[in-house]
Design a protein with these regions (language model features):
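Membrane-proximal cytoplasmic C-terminal regulatory module of class A 7TM GPCRs
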Residues: 208-224
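C-terminal transmembrane helical bundles of large multi-pass transporters
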Residues: 1-212
């Protein structure tokens, strides 16, 4: 395809003749454009809901940064393990991740806000939020990833044979792994990377936001203990 595209660049088209790439490449380009639009729409809808929920633009942007983390995680996972991925299933996985990974950020930010309402400083609040919400965040992400592992590796189990003969005929691979594998690995890579960064980057961004807000509105500065 690349050779054809390079040849077409130097080819002078006759009057009234239009040349374009068709077939699988055309379908892939249309699918990629659709998935990009779907991701943008989901991003916008999540942003609107979060702005209404938190009555702020800074906190939703902190939470939505996890979508970027998940995409980076997907690309890193594919690169490190040298996997060949379906563009369609990888795109669907990223769109699905957009609605999953933000939950961890919501848990941290919402709990930190609750602690600040009770009189804690921004530093104490986000520290307590990280300490209190770390277990739920890790358990939820781990359970989700473990649930995707059978799809990712193509685990097959014959329940009918298990009930009748006691032999489940367990094997790995098959036709279904070509369909579900890319989707599952996309979500596993993205969720694991985003969850790890949630517990590090989100609290840092929350404190930076609190510092900037204190300077802009002449509020009490955010104090961070040296120890």
């Amino acid at each position: 395809n690349k050779n054809i595209e390079n040849a077409l660049k130097d080819f002078k088209e006759p009057m009234g003749v239009t040349i374009k790439m068709g077939g699988a490449q055309e379908e892939q380009e249309e699918t990629s454009a659709f998935l990009g639009l779907a991701l943008a729409i989901s991003f916008l809808l999540i942003l609107i809901i979060l702005v209404i929920q938190f009555n702020s633009i800074g906190k939703p942007l902190i939470i939505l940064s996890e979508i970027l983390f998940s995409i980076i995680g997907v690309l890193l996972g594919i690169t490190i393990f040298h996997m060949e991925m379906s563009v369609v299933m990888m795109g669907i996985g990223i769109v699905a991740l957009a609605g999953i990974v933000v939950r961890n950020g919501i848990l941290l930010v919402e709990f930190a806000d609750l602690m600040m309402e009770q009189g804690m400083s921004a530093y104490e609040a986000i520290l307590e939020a990280g300490r209190t919400r770390m277990t739920p965040v890790l358990l939820t992400a781990t359970a989700t990833m473990l649930g995707l592992v059978p799809l990712a590796v193509g685990l097959n189990l014959d329940f009918a044979a298990l009930l009748s003969t006691g032999n489940p005929h367990i094997y790995f691979g098959g036709d279904n792994v070509a369909f579900w594998g890319p989707l599952s690995w996309t979500m596993i890579f993205g969720l694991s990377f985003a969850t790890f960064l949630t517990l590090i980057v989100v609290p840092s961004m929350y404190l930076i936001r609190a510092k900037v807000k204190a300077r802009l509105f002449d509020e009490k500065p955010v104090e961070i203990p040296e120890d």
